[in-house]
Amino acid sequence: MADPSSYRPKPGQIPDSPGVYKFRDEHRRVIYVGKAKNLRQRVANYFQDLANLHPRTRTMVTTAASVEWTVVSTEVEALQLEYSWIKEFDPRFNVKYRDDKSYPYLAVTLNEEFPRVQVMRGAKKKGVRYFGPYGHAWAIRETVDLMLRVFPVRTCSAGVFKNAARTGRPCLLGYIGKCSAPCVGRVTPEEHRELAEDFCDFMAGRTGTYIRRLEKDMMQAAEEMEYERAARLRDDAEALKRAMEKSAVVLADATDADLIAVAEDELEAALQIFHVRGGRVRGQRGWVTDKVEAVDTSGLVEHALQQLYGEERGDAVPKEVLVPALPEDPEAVSQWLADRRGSQVSLRIPQRGDKKDLMATVQRNAQQALGLHKTKRASDLTTRSRALEEIAEALGLDTAPLRIECYDISHLQGDDVVASMVVFEDGLARKSEYRRFQIKGFEGQDDVRSMHEVIGRRFKRYLQDKERTGEWEEAPEAAPGSASVHASATGPAATGQATAGPAAMGQAAAGPVSTGPAATGPVPAPELTAASPDDEPEPREDDGRPKRFAYPPQLVVVDGGQPQVAAARRALDELGIDDIAVCGLAKRLEEVWLPDDDDPVVLPRSSEGLYLLQRVRDEAHRFAITYQRAKRAKRIRSSPLDDVTGLGETRKQALIKHFGSVKKLRQATIDEICEVPGIGRRTAESVVAALATTAPAAPAVNTATGEIIEEDDGGSS
């Protein structure tokens, strides 16, 4: 009996998307298949206390040895894939799955004089149009109920139909407008068949025509002031849109295709293949490979095709192969595939429709597989230790860098320049010690100068904290620094400390900080902005909490090449810190730059050390660009009312709504502002004072005519 905790996925590995999951035993046989609207929540239920599980579920999870999952776009897709896998694998723990019947289809009996829409199971009949399969019969009934508003096709049995024809009275659906009542002659057989064919066309995917027609009729009815009819047409269009979601199918019934997707970074690539037969996903394959050579997506696709079909013949090679990028010589590859199949094979990139949507699902699975692989690789203790040792050896460090800090600069064409600092301890991200910086020492775009400023500010604070905690017996008084924010982190795994002496501290506290060769004078260190948006008061000397920058790294990594590395090293030298190593990662990840070296250090692509440096660099880039975008968005949405103390978002919106714009609010008197509900006189005076100190925006001018365009100066806040 296996222990479920031995194969339980780690927190965060399972996505919260719809999907299908499989439990396998120790012999890799599938023993259970299930579907979920939220994979993370559903799969987690299997790994609770065994005593709380149903006896059959308890037996299943103790028999299993692994669990796998596949992400899909919608719950309908999950139902279809679940059905395919249950039929394919016949899992032993699915014997009581639903009612053990074949899955239901939505059928239209076009072989009858008055076609009927109904739920059908079992063998297909000639002259009947089928749509599905569906997971439940009620799902079909919900779809049909929505569509009968627009396509009132017959749904009754033959007995009910004949009885209504004999009595001359239709059934209830005929009275409420969900059946055209051909039984009593309200429509002719030809008109009813046309309704049935329109119903089939919509279910087959030709949806846009009908929705556009309804919306056009709705607008026309509204113009003619027939509002009740317009409202019904609006509801009909909404019903069709909801039906589209409920009746989604993977692909057309006759489709045989393989869909291949690739997710990649500079070092690795994940491939996912969905095998579609008869319009349904019959199987899935995937693997992750190291990019041992410089290869693009086209090359990865070509390698995948060779491995997939190199030993296949006949129908094992499908009629259609859909890929994210064509090989370098698509004609030759297509001919190679055709030779193996014995007939023509279409190799192409899907551009629209259901195939493009399904390709997006395959792509999501590839991304998920790559992310899961990276998570497993990063969390392995042996792998992390080897990565740190490889970095130490490549950079000539005495010990493994147990604490690594990485810095990245982000801006948009020189505006909103920010920087990020991320921390990795023992090869794992320590997010509680991430920090963000605003570059305020100069204007414009200069990544090298920005890097120098950030490194100088960070380690100046480190020296100040070191003096404040009394680690030096003798040190000059530190100059007032920027406000400090309490950090919730504990001490680092690293044990080494910088050994800069009092002289260095004096330079850091009082002396000028150079910003590069072009600097002509002292540049005051601007305030530091931490991950928290607001600075907090200085902590007490004896509060026992770790300070924000109290722990030095053994290695500083900067995003960039030789210029950025030189700037970081110069900033450390100016502070008298000489025992912290510095390196930089150029855009080509195999190049690691060191200070004063003319040539980069080249690590093998398969190196765990290079892999760790890449993760550190990517995390710093992500953190920086997220902050930069948030800062830019805040600036764009800013309003003069933001500076009014005590004026919250609700009352700001009330002011704008009352006056229409900031421009009109600026022209209002205090008494007029007090008329707004919730605004007192003191607040009104603060609003007037704030707007008086803020100059109105310059008018917009049409550059072609010189005309001034009247615009309100900011309706948002």
From Swiss-Prot:
User: Is S-adenosyl-L-methionine there in the keyword field?
Assistant: no
GO MF terms here are: DNA binding; excinuclease ABC activity
Q: Which GO terms describe its biological process?
A: nucleotide-excision repair; SOS response
**CDD domains given for it?**
GIY-YIG_UvrC_Cho (cd10434)
Q: Which UniProt keywords apply?
A: Cytoplasm, DNA damage, DNA excision, DNA repair, Excision nuclease, SOS response
Q: Which residues form the UVR domain?
A: 208-243
Q: What does this protein do?
A: The UvrABC repair system catalyzes the recognition and processing of DNA lesions. UvrC both incises the 5' and 3' sides of the lesion. The N-terminal half is responsible for the 3' incision and the C-terminal half is responsible for the 5' incision.
**Which PANTHER family does the record cross-reference, listed alphabetically?**
UVRABC SYSTEM PROTEIN C, UVRC/OXIDOREDUCTASE
Q: What is this protein called?
A: UvrABC system protein C
Specify the species.
Answer: Streptomyces griseus subsp. griseus (strain JCM 4626 / CBS 651.72 / NBRC 13350 / KCC S-0626 / ISP 5235)
